[in-house]
From Swiss-Prot:
Extent of Polar residues compositional bias: 372-383
Subcellular location: Mitochondrion
Gene Ontology cellular component annotations, sorted alphabetically: mitochondrion
Protein's UniProt name: Altered inheritance of mitochondria protein 23, mitochondrial
Renumbered residue ranges of the record's region Disordered: 71-125, 372-396
Family: Belongs to the AIM23 family.
Sequence intervals crossing the membrane: none
Transit peptide boundaries: 1-22
Keywords: Mitochondrion, Transit peptide
Amino acid sequence: MLRQNRAGLLLVRKLHCSVVVMKPFDISQLARDNSSEKRNQGFNIESLIKNRMDLETDKVVSENATAAPNRFATMFDKEKRQAQKKTGPRRNSESTHHHNAGPYPKKPYGKTNSGSKTRPEIKTRPHKRVVRFEFKTGSDQAQAALKSIIAKVHALSTNYKIKFIDPVSGEVKLSNLVDIANSTDLREAGLQLLPCKEGDLPSIKKVSTREMLKLYSDELAAEKEKALLQSGSVAAQRALNQRLKSERKKSAAKLLNIFWNISLGDLKNQKKTELANRLCKGETFTIYLKRKGREVATPEGEGDEESETLNMYDIRRSLAHDEDALNIETQRRELISQQLFCILDEMPCTYEVEGQKENKLKVTVSPRQDAVKQSISPSSEECTLSAKDLKKQRQLQKQKEREELLKLKKQEKEDNLDSLYSFKIED
């Protein structure tokens, strides 16, 4: 009985303390109280008596627990909020500091002494220049070409700052593309974007409208061809191959190979005519005097190992491989080179000679602009004719020769028949 009364008193006391302190009651403590350690302890009557000192301490603990600050309760307290409305926020308060926080200082929004409401001050930023390109002149194609140049410049310089080459003085000046484009009459002139280094301002110069349109059309054609090649077009691949072949022919047309074993008659007749035709067209070309072992002339500085001096390979067809044959070949090369120089001296051109006769000679020939064209083997009419016209004339001439040959053959047959008939009649 005493043990049961003791446990009941302890339970009542703990419930009372939890209610006063506003803390949840931990039921697990009952298990701790009923542990074996407390069972072994003896009965203590003093624990059942709650003296005056214990009551006073419990009262102090309960007052401290109820007086603990609650920030949500104080924040939403009606009396304090009404008092703040009457007095207004303090200047150095946290709310004012939070209101003024930002990139620009702001004044507290409220009534001033005069009674008018003040608005926060906003600093105005400097006004940016409005970029406007005007397309009032020129055709649609010219305007499209100018727009493509503007797009390229914008990719290099977003503010359209450029280096403009003055067409009169040729000086390079810093300018803006807006001013240059708007002041250009596309009916008379156009613009061209020059290649520049990475990080530099783009360079612009004035060109003719025709040249600007040609560059723009070439650019569009290249983009179209690239797209067709990526899609696997066979026609585009064939056109590309044809263009590459024509470019190779043009580059090969600027070279003229003359071998050391050429005869003097061919040099005076055939090669002289070919040189005259090229000079009449105003071409600048290069002549290579070399041995027949190489078909393509190598530029300077390349193939030094193959370009050995005159040796037995140059006279491999000779029967006697001795010094006499070597001297004969040297004299022959001297004679051919001197004959070529005499032919060039008779023509209205200038030339420069490089190399050695023991290996090969490189002769760069350029026509003289001021010199009067002399009457060389090809007539002046042949020089003015184009390549197609010359080809047609040659074809007509060959056709005439064939017709004449056919006529001669027919006459021979008829004569043979007449002679045969006359022979039979006589018999």
